[in-house]
Swiss-Prot record:
Domain GIY-YIG: residue ranges: 13-92
Protein known as: UvrABC system protein C
Keyword Secreted carried by entry: no
Keywords linked to the UniProt accession: Cytoplasm, DNA damage, DNA excision, DNA repair, Excision nuclease, SOS response
Name of encoding gene: uvrC
GO CC annotation: cytoplasm; excinuclease repair complex
The family this protein is said to belong to: Belongs to the UvrC family.
HAMAP family noted in UniProt: UvrC
Function comment: The UvrABC repair system catalyzes the recognition and processing of DNA lesions. UvrC both incises the 5' and 3' sides of the lesion. The N-terminal half is responsible for the 3' incision and the C-terminal half is responsible for the 5' incision.
Protein origin, superkingdom: Bacteria
GO process terms (BP): nucleotide-excision repair; SOS response
Subcellular location: Cytoplasm
Primary location: cytoplasm
Subunit structure: Interacts with UvrB in an incision complex.
Amino acid sequence: MFDFQHQLKILPDKPGVYIMKNSLGEVIYVGKAKVLKNRVRQYFQNSKNHSEKVRAMVKNIAEFEYIVTDSEMEALILECNLIKKYSPRYNIALKDDKFYPFIKITTNEDFPRVYVTRNFAKDGNRYFGPYTNGTAVYEVMGLIKKLFPLRTCKKAIVEGGEPTRACLNYHINLCKAPCAGYISKAEYWEMIDEIINILNGTDTSIIKKLKLEMEKAAEELEFEKAAKIRDRILAIELISEKQKMFTVKEGDEDFIDLYTDEKDGCAQVFFVREGKVTGREHFMIENIGDDPVKEVISSFIASFYGGTAQIPKTIYVPEEIEDQELIEKFLTEKRGSKVWIKVPKKGDKKNLLDMVRNNAKIMLDQFKEKMVEEKELNKSALTELADVLGLDSLPVRIEAYDISNIQGVDSVGTMVVFENGKAKNSDYRRFKIKSVKGPNDYESMREILSRRFSHGLEEVNKIKERNLEYSNGKFCIFPDLIMMDGGKGQVNIALEVLKGFGIEIPVCGLVKDHKHRTRGIILNNEEILIRRGSGLMNLITRVQDEVHRYAITYHRSLRDKRTLHSILEDIPRIGEKRRRNLLMKFGSIDNIKKASMEELLDTPGIDKRAAESIKQYFSS
């Protein structure tokens, strides 16, 4: 039993993060504190000063733990990371949490690649963005590819390395083939420097130079050449124009406001660049309840700017936010220069902030309308499903299973989960078939169902004994309905397995027609036809398509890995760890075969003798 009085008494007088848990060990709230002792004790004192949401949370707290940090800033960063990790019920949850795309230039490579990524990291490479307009970033990348024939492969190419055969991109003028030694590092970097200058928007010498070349070509009556240079100039100008929308400068500003109803809210952000509104984004925030606006916006700003590379100099908000000084310091450190959070009282900036709030209200109303419509459609489909199957209640949680193999090789099983009619990807599970030899789908299904419910019962017992936290369980939640991607045989196997464990869960099968389209449901060894186009047909089709897709994808990945491993296993001095490192670095047998001695030696765990063994194997 958790001793609250003792734990509250020994709380430290230091900054840190506290983690509240319910009786199942599930994390329900994460918070930061300047002084842990003072902040955590407040929750368990007079509840009259608490909001309704906080009172509800405190009732559910069965235990808490804390992490001491060296500073309040560290506590803020850790709080953001833990909220992302656990998605606690009582923390502010962004419904539309987005990771905006960046253009990444791998400047730590001899021959850099340029591509779009949603993962920003301090890894020594150059990033441009984030691009709040996803279409714009791909338009910019398309123009860059037209202008600059850069490599797109993931090969480890170093200057002076062993040349390899040029790929198709070289022959269609989309790559200069540094892999084959057709371009020097210095020449390649001239293109990279041009791209960086264009994306920075700081160097107009490129366009001036091209205009001179175009004029010269025209004077010499080389009109085709002049036209190509003109197209190049137009493309560069278009990139520069698009970049202006996303390059944060000294005078650039973001405007953030919030609109809430009795339960949820919408945060709206307007991006102002060079005095013009160039873009906007909205985020739905669920279960706000009666949380103060200053707390919600403070949490939103920490979350929104926590994963972005660029932060404006000034952020305007409707009122002073909680921990404003700390948040400003946090953003200043990320930006590298002073960031201000201000409250406009009158004038154009106040009017623009009012517009932001009005737009937030419109987006929240539209979102609610859409959610209600989607919820009603799913509820209607689940109600129809319950009627067809004769269930006493709606099957809120559905688990669907499928087997995939080719002639019994690399047999796998998969489980997908739908809750309230929507796919819940975080609960998907994959199984390698261990005990069944050859193509036997029935016994393979018996194995994965036995493993799933065996693990589930074990976890339930561990949770009861407090040896496992509910949030860490993978199989402890049981479904209201099981769907088998197959007919009578698969359904009967599932019923046998459940009976063996003493578990009562309804089971049905999903069958397809001769065109491989979902046709109906198998129940009690009889097929029930479902009307095409109905809400129920749409639901079971989504379930069947998803479990089949997940099974095929997993089987394909295992098959590819097995093919790679089977060849590498024949190479002397290359054990399991070295095989894994080679695959991680080169990605394919072909790339390993083409790798130079230097590239092989640069692979973790590969010494000179192992590298020589690889070269000898592929040259024989």
